[in-house]
Regions:
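Metal-dependent phosphoesterase signature
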Residues: 35, 55-93
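Short, acidic loop-to-helix structural element flanking the phosphoryl-transfer center
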Residues: 79-105, 111-115
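Active-site neighborhood of HAD-like aspartate-dependent phosphohydrolases
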Residues: 1-43, 60
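Asp-based, Mg2+/Mn2+-dependent phosphohydrolase catalytic module
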Residues: 1-3, 110-111, 115-221
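Helix-loop "lid/cap" segments that line or gate small-molecule binding pockets
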Residues: 26-29, 49-64, 117, 151-152, ...
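Residue-level detector of anion-binding/catalytic polar loops
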Residues: 35, 102-104, 181, 205
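Conserved SAM-binding loop
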Residues: 14, 103-106, 164-165
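Hydrophobic packing residues within well-ordered alpha-helices of enzyme cores
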Residues: 25, 54, 91, 98, ...
């Protein structure tokens, strides 16, 4: 299918930020008496929004979770992301090759954080106002399909005509539930060999290790 528009996840698809999130999450949970490695944080929590992450932590640890866990994570996140994050390799070139298609971002992160990092990378102009946050624009963030349905409606394009680029099983589940076509991208520094299999298990038919490979698959000049 030749898509009518492309929707990008942000963390791990545009910004190489997931490894930083996993590091701070593992460190903060371990300091709170909930031993969590970076690898476990990547596997358990990548792709979730803030509320969903806290729910997953509660499901994992139960009554051992400190009552101020949300505040601890918020404070550590502010520190860890005080500096901008780098771009995923190849995203600028891919955006330059898809200017004929409408694009949007559908993320679990805040629009302020997304815009600040788009400005830092120098690609904000590719998305205009089409930046959508699961914590700001819809009631339920990923893995629910709401944010992708919202982005599709804002673009005026049926979900079945969209191509979504995702790096996490959680995000892929959301996009597929919305009725979109989904490809996996494993170009981030957080991506491990098992990620391709995890994306496939969610129903993602094609997974690409680079934006160059994805561009070739789409037949982009």
């Amino acid at each position: 299918m030749t898509p009518d528009a492309i929707i990008f996840d942000f963390d791990g698809v545009i910004a190489d930020s997931e490894i930083r999130s996993a590091e701070l999450l593992g460190r903060t949970l371990t300091a709170a008496g909930l031993p969590t490695s970076e690898e476990e944080a990547l596997e358990r929590y990548t792709g979730y929004g803030r509320v969903e992450t806290l729910a997953a932590i509660a499901a994992r640890w139960g009554a051992r979770v400190p009552t101020d866990m949300a505040e601890r994570l918020a404070a550590e996140t502010t520190i860890a992301f005080a500096q901008p994050v780098p771009a995923i390799t190849g995203v600028e070139a891919f955006l330059a090759r898809t200017t004929h298609l409408p694009r949007a971002i559908a993320s679990s992160s805040s629009t302020g954080y997304i815009r600040a990092n788009l400005d830092h990378i120098g690609i904000a102009g590719h998305f205009g106002d089409h930046i959508y946050s699961g914590r700001e624009h819809v009631a339920r963030s990923k893995p629910f399909p709401d944010i992708y349905l919202h982005a599709a409606a804002a673009l005026g394009i049926a979900p079945a005509r969209l191509l979504v680029i995702e790096d996490s099983p959680v995000g892929a589940r959301a996009a597929l539930a919305a009725g979109a076509s989904v490809v996996g991208l494993t170009a981030g520094s957080h991506c491990r060999p098992a990620l391709s299999d995890a994306l496939a298990a969610e129903g993602v038919g094609r997974v690409f290790a680079s934006y160059a490979a994805l561009a070739d698959h789409l037949g982009l000049a």
